[in-house]
Amino acid sequence: MAKKVVGEIKLQIAATKANPSPPVGPALGQQGVNIMEFCKAFNERTKDMAGYNIPVVITVYADKSFTFITKQPPATDLIKKAAGITKGADNPLKNKVGQLTKAQILEIVDKKIVDMNTKDKEQAAKIISGSARSMGITVVD
């Protein structure tokens, strides 16, 4: 028989940097989850993704056990790293802060497509390009 799910927690945590301090500790503590056990498991699973914020969905069961799924880093993090910038433009229509090539967009799509709402690479590239433009980044051929 399947375990009874009592909660689902969605967080974004820096890879390899999960610790009991907020926001992780309070979110897990409210559900009665062993915080250190989660932190160790999360840090181990994300050791090859250092430098990114990782979205994680934690499913908590009635016996206080848990499972979690890590997703790919947000598209904006991947875009910023590819463009070599730390933040997007404050006014993307007037200020351009960097540029990406179609090849760089396709690299991002290859990493991110598993978490996107399309499986078509062409459509996914349009989504990523739109995100880049809204950050003040020019997409060039």
UniProtKB/Swiss-Prot annotation:
A GO cellular component annotation here is: cytosolic large ribosomal subunit
**Which PROSITE patterns does the UniProt record give?**
RIBOSOMAL_L11
- Cross-referenced SUPFAM superfamilies: Ribosomal L11/L12e N-terminal domain, Ribosomal protein L11, C-terminal domain
SMART domains per the record? Answer: RL11
Leader peptide range in chain numbering: none
Keywords annotated in UniProt = Methylation, Ribonucleoprotein, Ribosomal protein, RNA-binding, rRNA-binding
**Pfam families in the cross-refs:** Ribosomal_L11 (PF00298), Ribosomal_L11_N (PF03946)
Task: State any single GO MF term.
Answer: structural constituent of ribosome
User: What does UniProt say on post-translational modification here?
Assistant: One or more lysine residues are methylated.
Name its GO BP terms in alphabetical order.
translation
Q: Which InterPro entries match?
A: Ribosomal_uL11 (IPR000911), Ribosomal_uL11_bac-typ (IPR006519), Ribosomal_uL11_C (IPR020783), Ribosomal_uL11_C_sf (IPR036769), Ribosomal_uL11_CS (IPR020785), Ribosomal_uL11_N (IPR020784), Ribosomal_uL11_N_sf (IPR036796)
Q: What is the documented function of this protein?
A: Forms part of the ribosomal stalk which helps the ribosome interact with GTP-bound translation factors.
The record's subunit annotation is: Part of the ribosomal stalk of the 50S ribosomal subunit. Interacts with L10 and the large rRNA to form the base of the stalk. L10 forms an elongated spine to which L12 dimers bind in a sequential fashion forming a multimeric L10(L12)X complex.
**PANTHER family from the xrefs?**
60S RIBOSOMAL PROTEIN L12, LARGE RIBOSOMAL SUBUNIT PROTEIN UL11M
Entry's family note: Belongs to the universal ribosomal protein uL11 family.
What is the name of this protein? Large ribosomal subunit protein uL11
